[in-house]
């Protein structure tokens, strides 16, 4: 019997994927649970990844004409009461503030000073931003109104999981107002495409782009679109959404404008957002049984040097050797930003430091000892490959660093894209459909592409098997066929999957 390969993370993905996910977060020192149930503490490595995502996406948002602003965390209950469908969708998740101070009674602090109107802690900002739009927009000359905010939101979560489902999470939410439905729809799809490009080119995470079915729409939206990614366990993760809100919110909040002809019309609005859930997607898309593998575009530190010192004088020798290398690398660019280079000078054993960076998923890890200095080289580990250092001349590292990082980025994307392609199957019969989902193992789960009639009475069968409809992909064949669930006529194909 062969001996099991030793891994830095236990259990492995195959043994217990949910627990493996938690252990990767712990091993990479990204985040931890907080004393507040359902909330997380994002540690520097995890927050550095979020900052890299922010920088890239913020640039894309601004390049499409949007400006950043900030709105209050607290929303008057009366604002939410104006939009019944919206409130119904979030009612069970809302945190509500009812008092404005604490007083000491019998040695304990108790709430006092009941508010005249309860305040809801922001679950999303359509209502309070809509209130501002109603003041800011008077004429067609004020349109389109294009704003974005980076903020935190709160939605009570019964089954929390770090990055994937937390009571408080970080996100960006874009909100826009337009004169016509066509302009608003163009905006909705434009920002969906921004998300697709960011997910694939920056996170190295391939996605399926499409429209959500009616029962999965954002509360109060006319249409919701999403990008859906496959995790390594074959489950789907909704990685971003963009909503065409029609005139529902503008009518509820009186967002009107005077037309060029002197008439008055309600605006058409949109909203769109992604959150720290993306980090969970990066983990489950790319990490392996030795820890995280961070796509270079979002790695807080892209090249890490680990000095190997054994005798007096080694430290100074290696420092002198690394100084010009670090200087030359730090002057280079990758992905539109300066290379992020780090020398780990902590007083820890070199193997301990090396394994820490392996578990964190730094794209390039270079060990440097006296023999490497003598040979003018480094022992380079690429986190997308074997963990044995390859002797690399220092001049080659300096000249090819950006190209190596780009190759790692492409490798991670290709691995994920290959898995998505190989584990997405098209079926035409209910028997085949159920046979695919009968395999509920980590590496056996698949996405199913099949026709669906759109009738709500078919959803009970999906609930029975814990299967969801992810979206209606944009790339449709348009051919007539039958619904895989009901046998009724159907032309649209949808993506069925187990999901997070």
Curated annotation (Swiss-Prot):
It catalyses: tRNA(Pro) + L-proline + ATP = L-prolyl-tRNA(Pro) + AMP + diphosphate. One of its GO terms (biological process) is prolyl-tRNA aminoacylation. One of its GO terms (molecular function) is proline-tRNA ligase activity. PROSITE patterns: AA_TRNA_LIGASE_II (PS50862). It is found in: Cytoplasm. Keywords: Aminoacyl-tRNA synthetase, ATP-binding, Cytoplasm, Ligase, Nucleotide-binding, Protein biosynthesis. It comes from the Bacteria. SMART domains: ProRS-C_1. GO terms for cellular component: aminoacyl-tRNA synthetase multienzyme complex; cytoplasm. Its main location: cytoplasm. Its EC number is 6.1.1.15. Catalyzes the attachment of proline to tRNA(Pro) in a two-step reaction: proline is first activated by ATP to form Pro-AMP and then transferred to the acceptor end of tRNA(Pro). NCBIfam families: proS_fam_I. Homodimer. Belongs to the class-II aminoacyl-tRNA synthetase family. ProS type 3 subfamily. Consists of three domains: the N-terminal catalytic domain, the anticodon-binding domain and the C-terminal extension. HAMAP family: Pro_tRNA_synth_type3 (MF_01571). This is Proline--tRNA ligase. The gene is proS.
């Amino acid at each position: 019997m062969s001996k099991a390969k030793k891994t830095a993370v236990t259990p492995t993905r195959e043994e217990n994927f949910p627990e493996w996910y938690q252990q990767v977060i712990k091993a990479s020192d990204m985040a931890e649970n907080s004393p507040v149930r359902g909330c997380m503490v994002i540690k520097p490595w995890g927050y550095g990844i979020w900052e890299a995502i922010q920088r890239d996406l913020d640039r894309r948002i601004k390049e499409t004409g949007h400006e950043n602003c900030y709105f209050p965390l607290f929303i008057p209950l009366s604002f939410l009461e104006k939009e019944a469908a919206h409130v119904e969708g979030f009612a069970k998740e809302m945190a509500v503030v009812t008092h404005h101070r604490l007083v000491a009674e019998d040695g304990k602090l108790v709430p006092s000073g009941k508010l005249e109107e309860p305040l809801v802690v922001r679950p999303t900002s359509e209502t309070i931003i809509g209130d501002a739009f109603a003041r800011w927009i008077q004429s067609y000359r004020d349109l389109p109104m294009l704003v974005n905010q980076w903020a935190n939101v709160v939605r009570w979560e019964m089954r929390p999981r770090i990055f994937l489902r937390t009571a408080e999470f970080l996100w960006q939410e874009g909100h826009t107002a337009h004169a016509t439905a066509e302009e608003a729809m163009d905006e909705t799809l434009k920002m969906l495409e921004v998300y697709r490009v960011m997910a694939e080119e920056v996170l190295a995470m391939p996605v399926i782009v499409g429209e959500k079915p009616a029962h999965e729409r954002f509360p109060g939206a006319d249409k919701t679109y999403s990008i859906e990614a496959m995790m390594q366990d074959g489950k789907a993760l909704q990685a971003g959404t963009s909503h065409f809100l029609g005139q529902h919110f503008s009518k509820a909040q009186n967002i009107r404008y005077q037309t060029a002809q002197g008439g008055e019309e309600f605006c058409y609005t949109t909203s769109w957002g992604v959150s720290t859930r993306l980090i969970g997607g990066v983990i489950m898309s790319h990490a392996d049984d030795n820890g995280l593998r961070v796509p270079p575009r979002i790695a807080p530190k892209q090249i890490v040097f680990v000095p190997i010192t054994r005798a007096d004088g080694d430290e100074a020798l290696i420092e002198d050797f690394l100084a010009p290398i670090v200087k030359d690398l730090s002057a280079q660019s990758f992905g539109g930003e300066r290379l992020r280079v780090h020398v780990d000078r902590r007083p820890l054993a070199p193997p301990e430091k090396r394994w820490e960076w392996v578990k964190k998923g730094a794209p390039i890890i270079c060990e440097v000892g006296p023999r490497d200095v003598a040979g003018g080289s480094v022992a380079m580990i690429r986190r997308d490959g074997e963990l044995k250092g390859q002797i690399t001349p220092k001049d080659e590292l300096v000249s090819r660093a950006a190209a190596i990082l780009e190759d790692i980025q492409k490798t991670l994307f290709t691995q994920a894209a290959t898995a998505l392609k190989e584990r997405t199957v098209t079926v035409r019969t209910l028997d085949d459909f159920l046979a695919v989902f009968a395999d509920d193992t980590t590496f056996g789960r698949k996405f199913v592409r099949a026709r669906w009639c759109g009738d709500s009475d078919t959803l009970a069968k999906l609930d029975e098997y814990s299967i969801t409809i992810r979206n209606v992909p944009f790339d449709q064949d348009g051919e007539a066929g039958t619904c895989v669930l009901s046998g009724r006529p159907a032309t649209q194909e949808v993506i069925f999957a187990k999901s997070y």
